[in-house]
């Protein structure tokens, strides 16, 4: 049984319960990270590109109503989800979405960026500077060099950007203004 606790209106309550019984969670290893009204938030046990898969389950029906990937790199430093009310009173969730494209911005430049802007609804956003790539002429990473080895220039690009989601009655995800970051996909 899960008991919801009160929290500030723009945050999830500070709780983490690992559920390892598929009968209780519906998915082995997912972690309950909080509740907001009738909505239960779950996080996957592992992630990529600085993000974690999360899902939202309607407590009233027990059905999953939404799933995506959010930037959750340091939960103690920053709350990954923000909550607000739309003018019509519906709850909005805000977070930094993590996606992986099917091309490399450093390698393919504006042709890749144009495809990704359309695919992810990023409008007329300027092309972001990408990190984590080996630049032409740069030496390869050699153990025991410090840091993370840079990826080849042709590695697909991962993007993080701010979105807001209206969950009910049907999920609707919209990019919102803010910084778009690009890195080499893991």
What are these regions, as identified by a protein language model?
Residues 4-6, 55-60:
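Structural recognition of the beta-propeller blade-terminating site
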Residues 24-33, 69-86:
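Repeated scaffold domains used in trafficking and secretory/extracellular systems
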Residues 4, 42-47, 94-101:
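Beta-strand C-termini and the immediately following turn/loop, strongest in propeller blades
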Residues 76-186:
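Acidic, small-residue rich beta-repeat scaffolds with periodic aromatic anchors
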Residues 32, 44-51:
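His-enriched metal-coordination microenvironments in redox/metal-binding proteins
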Residues 1-26, 147-158, 175-179:
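Terminal domain-start segments
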């Amino acid at each position: 049984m899960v008991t919801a606790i009160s929290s500030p209106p723009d945050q999830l309550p500070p709780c983490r319960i690992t559920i390892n019984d598929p009968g209780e969670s519906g998915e082995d290893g997912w972690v309950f990270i909080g509740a907001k009204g009738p909505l239960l938030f779950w996080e996957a046990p592992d992630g990529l590109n600085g993000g974690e898969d999360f899902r939202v389950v309607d407590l009233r029906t027990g059905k999953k109503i939404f799933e995506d990937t959010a930037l959750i790199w340091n939960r103690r430093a920053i709350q990954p989800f923000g909550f607000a009310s739309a003018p019509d009173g519906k709850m909005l969730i805000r977070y930094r979405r993590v996606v992986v494209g099917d091309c490399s911005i450093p390698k393919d430049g504006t042709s890749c960026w144009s495809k990704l802007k359309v695919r992810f609804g990023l409008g007329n956003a300027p092309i972001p500077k990408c990190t984590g790539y080996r630049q032409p002429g740069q030496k390869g990473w050699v153990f025991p060099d410090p840091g993370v080895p840079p990826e080849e220039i042709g590695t697909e690009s991962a993007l993080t950007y701010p979105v807001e989601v209206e969950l009910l009655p049907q999920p609707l995800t919209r990019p919102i203004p803010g910084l778009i970051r690009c890195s080499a996909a893991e």
